[in-house]
């Protein structure tokens, strides 16, 4: 395999290539539009013949997430992918993974909902991804790519963060990013971790086989004594606090002198970057803040912009208004925060967002 390759491919396809190149040990999934190309590409590439990576189509999303649980318990780099309703079926398993502090990677290529909805792109799963993803007090690490290149790069970053914090990580994409084709630079092949490396790095928790010099590692999220369960929950919250302090990622475009700031992620942010250019051409000082990590969310940068004197924020999302709640919490009343969105698989255009910005903030009396 070449050390470095530049190819034209879909976002979903590049997930498969990145998984192999970044040393993934196993993929367990079930097909659902608009992300089915992830597993299809893996099947075509046959990594079991080159790197030894396991690729398996489970009988359901529920089975696939529980296979991920089993693989993650052994310290292996394992992953799955699905789209909105499929992720809902995985939610119990995601909670179990978080409760047992198991690292893994989940791809959600969002589609319009609720219910079966449509196969067109949406960002309606923000609450589901960022406010837990299942029952109980837990968080997933959530990365939001806005390009095919970032789909590729986030695979490595998500795995690294998942293992650093022993926590499930999600790449929250959408049908637009998953299906669009762009030039992408593929990473050099990383070798998969050896059993000896896994034993050294995951010795304290993974069930890779018990050596004589340590106690048994037991993987579970069960604790029937309330006092102990509270201690476990508090420890998890400390981990999330560390994530919020150390792992926030975001991008600012034209925010240095901005009077108004658009907040958008994923494919919406790509559209809104054109909105910023249009606004600047009209003499309007408009900037864009793009959260790259949706959890942990960039609260501090937003608060700093508000404290600096930004006159208003527009949260532009492909939903009825979800991330806007986190923007309002971050701004904390220092400036008006409004929402503009499209739903049901509809995308907004750059000029639509500019019109909304003017109506809701700039020209509002």
Please annotate each region the language model reported:
Residues 250-284, 289, 295-301:
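Redox- and metal-dependent alpha/beta enzyme cores, enriched for Fe-S-associated oxidoreductases
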Residues 140-197, 352-365:
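Structural signature of the thiamine diphosphate
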Residues 37-131, 141-163:
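Thiamine diphosphate
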Residues 8-14, 237-260, 273:
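Glycine-/acidic-rich phosphate or pyrophosphate-binding loops and their flanking alpha/beta elements
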Residues 317-365:
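Peripheral docking tails and interdomain loops at the edges
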Residues 166-252:
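Conformationally flexible catalytic loops at phosphate/diphosphate-handling active centers
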Residues 7-44:
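N-terminal glycine-rich anion-binding loops that anchor highly charged ligand groups
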């Amino acid at each position: 395999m070449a050390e470095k390759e530049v190819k034209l491919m879909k976002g979903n396809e590049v997930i498969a290539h990145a998984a192999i190149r970044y040393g993934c040990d196993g993929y367990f999934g079930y097909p659902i539009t608009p992300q089915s190309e992830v597993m299809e590409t893996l099947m075509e590439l046959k990594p079991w013949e080159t790197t030894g990576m396991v690729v398996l189509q489970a009988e359901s999303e529920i089975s696939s997430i529980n296979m991920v649980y089993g693989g993650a318990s052994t310290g292996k780099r394992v992953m799955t992918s699905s789209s909105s309703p499929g992720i809902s079926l995985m939610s119990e398993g995601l909670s179990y993974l978080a409760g047992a502090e198991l690292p893994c990677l989940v791809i959600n290529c969002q589609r319009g909902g609720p219910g079966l909805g449509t196969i067109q792109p949406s960002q309606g799963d923000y609450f589901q991804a960022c406010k837990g993803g299942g029952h109980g007090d837990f968080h997933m690490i959530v990365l939001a790519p806005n390009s095919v290149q970032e789909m590729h790069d986030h695979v490595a970053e998500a795995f690294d963060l998942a293992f650093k914090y022993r926590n499930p990580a999600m790449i929250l994409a959408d049908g637009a990013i998953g299906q669009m084709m762009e030039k992408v630079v593929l990473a050099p092949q990383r070798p998969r971790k050896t059993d000896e490396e896994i034993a050294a790095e995951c010795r304290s928790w993974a069930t890779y086989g018990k050596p004589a010099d340590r106690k048994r590692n037991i993987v579970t999220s069960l604790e029937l004594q309330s006092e102990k369960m509270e201690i476990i929950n508090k420890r998890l919250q400390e981990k999330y606090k560390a994530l919020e302090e150390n792992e926030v990622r975001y991008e600012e475009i034209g925010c240095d002198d901005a009077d108004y700031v658009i907040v958008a992620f994923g494919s919406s942010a790509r559209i809104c970057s054109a909105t910023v250019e249009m606004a600047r051409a009209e003499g309007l000082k408009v900037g864009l803040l793009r959260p790259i990590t949706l959890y942990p969310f960039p609260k501090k940068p937003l608060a700093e912009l508000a404290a600096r004197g930004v006159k208003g924020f527009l949260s532009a999302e492909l939903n009825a208004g979800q991330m806007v709640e986190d923007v309002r919490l971050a701004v904390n009343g220092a400036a008006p925060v409004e929402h503009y969105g499209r739903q049901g698989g509809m995308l907004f255009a750059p000029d639509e967002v500019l019109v909304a910005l003017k109506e809701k903030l700039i020209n509002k009396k």
